[in-house]
Regions:
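Non-catalytic, glycine-rich low-complexity segments
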Residues: 1-33
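Aromatic- and glycine-rich beta-strand/loop motifs that create alpha-glucan
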Residues: 30-75, 83-84
Length: 84
């Protein structure tokens, strides 16, 4: 699996937002204790090529989990894995 840079991100725009610096992810989850974003090569992939684990100290504001990931590009396939 590839390593990704996980920056703080912006909690104010929910969803996946393309920016000049990468893709910003923001999702509401009141009960989450752990959030991962898994990235896939294509629709048939069974395992992710990269996983970004969000740090609650820098990637959580209230009930919003957020991250800016510079390596992610438009059209990337992803899913959230949330514990809690």
């Amino acid at each position: 699996m590839s390593n990704l840079t996980v920056l703080g991100g912006d909690p104010h725009r929910l969803g996946a937002t393309i920016t000049d610096n990468g893709v910003n992810f923001a999702i509401f989850s009141r009960d989450a204790v752990r959030v991962l974003i898994c990235f896939f090569e294509n629709y048939n992939s069974k395992t992710p090529y990269a996983v970004a684990e969000l740090d609650p100290a820098k990637n959580r504001t209230g009930d919003i989990w957020h991250a800016l990931i510079p390596e992610v590009k438009k059209g990337s396939l992803y899913l959230y894995r949330i514990d809690g």
